[in-house]
Amino acid sequence: MIISASTDYRAAAERKLPPFLFHYADGGAYAEHTLRRNVADLSNIELRQRVLKNMSELDLSTELFGEKMSMPVGLAPVGLTGMYARRGEVQAAKAAAAKGIPFTLSTVSVCPIEEVAPAIDRPMWFQLYVLKDRGFMRNALERAKAAGCSTLVFTVDMPVPGARYRDAHSGMSGPNGPLRRVLQAMTHPQWAWDVGVMGKPHDLGNISAYRGNPTGLADYIGWLGANFDPSISWKDLEWIRDFWDGPMVIKGILDPEDARDAVTFGADGIIVSNHGGRQLDGVLSSARALPAIADAVKGELKILADSGIRTGLDVVRMLALGADTVLLGRAFIYALAVAGQAGVSNLLDLIEKEMRVAMVLTGAKSIAEITSDLLVKER
């Protein structure tokens, strides 16, 4: 298959991956209305085309939390990334570092912190959930700090797992899940050899290091699910703020009041996110939630956004809506599944190319010039 656009990777990934893995990344919660709206609402954002502005020189670079970035894009934390390519977290991190942008390692990564951090020449970010096992949280924070992780991404929109019905249909969970996954792997021999055989171990590295024994897929569904903490409040985050001396970003903000609470708490940034439509179906898309949040807290902390971003044009739209930086999730997972590190590198090049086209045709010569002035106002 010819890859000519950033969106081409999805179809290629569906052909290459066993269904349980493709649908785990591709699916959302309940009937997946929010999942679809994330993409549709962003696609419906109209930009003002400007001409004759001498756009011969563009500057896509930016800076976030003291880190220089070649463009305002990072890779979001995605669980089980190492199941989509051999040692997938390492490959994705290398692609991000080569591009000069941050990579965020998930709590539930296959490759542990200690494997990924030394593989790249810039500090990575680390994502953490609030879990009942506070000992694990402290252990993970200590290891992230020791490995030189620069920014902590704290996910707060998962006090309980979302109802992801597609996982049960695909074999990721549900009746006879293990048998169905084996049968699917047998019909996808390229993945079975490259990842299933050569990509071992398939345990959850960060959790295994704490528990002292391998933590496989069944434990991911079991131990982690049992450890999500619905009693979480802002007060529970105070000890983490005291312990972590680097930038701290709160992921999962959709309401201006929560954004203001994050400012009061002392967060360095927030991520406007609905978990890619994987938690509560029916909530606002990130594109619709972002403008009100930007109006409430812009300038008081950094605003990042994810969910629904598939192209460089989408990046420009999110920046115009008020984001300082965006994070890619599914988009890079599809590319990783298709071609590993090279796939992610090519995706990022395509994203940059698409951004450049959008900036030239809207008259924005730098990231600072991508503002709400680029948006078509409702008449």
Swiss-Prot record:
Alphabetized CDD domains for the sequence: alpha_hydroxyacid_oxid_FMN (cd02809)
An MF annotation (GO) of this entry: FMN binding
The entry's keywords: Cell inner membrane, Cell membrane, Flavoprotein, FMN, Membrane, Oxidoreductase
Cofactor: FMN
Primary subcellular site in the record, as a coarse category: membrane
Family matches, as PROSITE patterns: FMN_HYDROXY_ACID_DH_1, FMN_HYDROXY_ACID_DH_2
Binding site for FMN: 106, 127, 155, 251, 306-330
Record bears the keyword Cell membrane: yes
GO biological process: one example: lactate metabolic process
Annotated catalytic residues: 275
NCBIfam families, A to Z: L_lactate_LldD, PRK11197.1
The protein's name: L-lactate dehydrogenase
Organism: Ectopseudomonas mendocina (strain ymp)
Name of the coding gene: lldD
